[in-house]
């Protein structure tokens, strides 16, 4: 049975960059666990803000956290009170100085993580899974996505036997490295159990830096 590699991990170093940007030898395990705890806390605290991704950068004794969100107003709060509260609580979870930066996601409809969370929320509200999936597909294509694939697995519709359902529209070439494919996963906690929601969104093609930096060949095909 064929398995699919993670689309983002597959493109790291080609057209995608890492969400944790730092290098360490001795304290690697400590910093890795610290990153996990910081991400879990931000996701739990700002669950209603539509968090797409959380980037963590480290330099010297400083930690910079970039929160990509569809609703920056919820994160910042009234006169910046919300972001200051979160910053103080994050400061208590690390020995380093914390800098918190909020980045707005312009098109939430073509962000795979936000689309997956939206489908999961609809399933928790007892909306029919086919309706939720088809609506997300149509909305993504309407806002400029080149292709989208949506998959849900679990006790769909409360059936006794779990199953796997998926829809696809447009192009979603998983093995083309230059294809800018965003991937998101979310879980819907229903009375029948958990339902997994996966979303792949093709947003276009990106030429890798290494390829774009090469000098063009002459008309005859000979190297300069």
Curated annotation (Swiss-Prot):
Gene Ontology biological process terms from the UniProt entry: translation
A Pfam family recorded for this sequence: KH_2
Start and end residues of each KH type-2 domain: 38-106
Keyword Membrane assigned: no
UniProtKB keywords: Ribonucleoprotein, Ribosomal protein, RNA-binding, rRNA-binding
A GO cellular-component term linked to this record: cytosolic small ribosomal subunit
Coiled coil: none
Molecular functions (GO terms): mRNA binding; rRNA binding; structural constituent of ribosome
Entry-linked Gene3D superfamilies: 3.30.300.20, Ribosomal protein S3, C-terminal domain
Family: Belongs to the universal ribosomal protein uS3 family.
Subunit structure: Part of the 30S ribosomal subunit. Forms a tight complex with proteins S10 and S14.
Record's function text: Binds the lower part of the 30S subunit head. Binds mRNA in the 70S ribosome, positioning it for translation.
Protein name per Swiss-Prot or TrEMBL: Small ribosomal subunit protein uS3
Gene label: rpsC
